[in-house]
Amino acid sequence: MSVLKNDRLLRALQRQPVDRTPVWMMRQAGRYLPEYRELRAQAGSFMKLAGTPELACEVTLQPLRRFPLDAAILFSDILTIPDAMGLGLRFLPGEGPVFDHPVRSAADIEHLPVPDPEDELRYVTDAVRLIRRELDGEVPLIGFAGSPWTLATYMIEGGSSKDYRRCKAMLYDEPELLHRLLDKVAQATTAYLNAQIAAGAQAIMIFDSWGGALAHDAYRLFSLAYMERIVRNLTREADGRHVPVVLFTKGGGQWLEAMAATGCDGLGLDWTTNLGQARDRVGDRVALQGNLDPCVLYASPETIRNEVARVLADYGPGPGHVFNLGHGIHPAIPPEHAGAMIDAVHQLSPRYHEQQAEASSLTQG
């Protein structure tokens, strides 16, 4: 495959010196872009868009044509695995994802297959291969999956939920049953992510969107333990380079030390956690990614610049920071405001890396 021309993201996730802080956005390929909305209308459905490698490739590349980003992230959905398990995924207007066959019993769990990522999920790995070819080494490609706990909430509830009542009832009444489901989903997720890496993904993110809904000890038992298992079993080198893994638990600020001990390379932070305090807590064990409040992008470009400056100052000098939002970019955000954020990172972050760049230059000299 092509030689990587911009490796800032991979270097930052390994806490190596960079000339400026790398930047990308969660959901950077999505509804806030008019070109995405046009292609989505042509495709006719979200599943057609995500399930067609050529279309998924085009959507993945769209934000890179607009913005000087330091990474591409695969356009897909976290629910591809339960869909491949036969749960019958549909997206309903105004309601979101719905499963026709939710998992509610021991028999349901027993009959769940572990999908072959090069069979039932071949459209994803084909998209990864196509994107890598089209990127031609410009920036690294991030692959991803949902955490087992987050996927289980959808599989048990049958869709989105505000209180996770069925899932939490199983957690408290039948914990062993939930563990059996999580074990199977973790197996499937590990195979799926390793297939993405084999196809060309150069970094991996695990999105634990609903881990923050768990009680303190329940998070460790029912979410973090399974993410740690996945991290331990992932392929960690491809194309002669380390493949970094980032864990992101929304609302996960209280568990940062435990998350850093999983063997991952980086932690994604939402906007409720102070970046500088997080850095003090985890030390140099992991890189940190984040964590601008996505709603800042509704504000003026001047305010956006000031808030970018605050996030950069919170982290402080030195390597190990990837600038990102604290969650996905909202559909109503003006694209120019995303551009203002990216420009501000480019302009304001080099000063935080000057000493490291000088030291690296002296070492190489």
UniProtKB/Swiss-Prot annotation:
Supply the alphabetized keyword list. Cytoplasm, Decarboxylase, Lyase, Porphyrin biosynthesis
Q: Where does substrate bind?
A: R27, Q28, A29, G30, R31, D77, Y154, S209, H327
- Listed EC numbers: 4.1.1.37
Entries under CDD domains matching the protein: URO-D
A GO term for molecular function:
uroporphyrinogen decarboxylase activity
Q: Which SUPFAM superfamilies match?
A: UROD/MetE-like
Q: Which reaction does this chain catalyze?
A: uroporphyrinogen III + 4 H(+) = coproporphyrinogen III + 4 CO2
Q: Which GO terms describe its cellular component?
A: cytosol
State the source organism's domain of life: Bacteria
Marked site (Transition state stabilizer) residue numbers: D77
Q: Which GO terms describe its biological process?
A: protoporphyrinogen IX biosynthetic process from glutamate
Q: Give the main location.
A: cytoplasm
Protein localization:
Cytoplasm
Q: What does this protein do?
A: Catalyzes the decarboxylation of four acetate groups of uroporphyrinogen-III to yield coproporphyrinogen-III.
Alphabetical list of NCBIfam families matching this protein: hemE
Family listed? Belongs to the uroporphyrinogen decarboxylase family.
Protein name (Swiss-Prot/TrEMBL): Uroporphyrinogen decarboxylase
- Annotated organism of origin: Alkalilimnicola ehrlichii (strain ATCC BAA-1101 / DSM 17681 / MLHE-1)
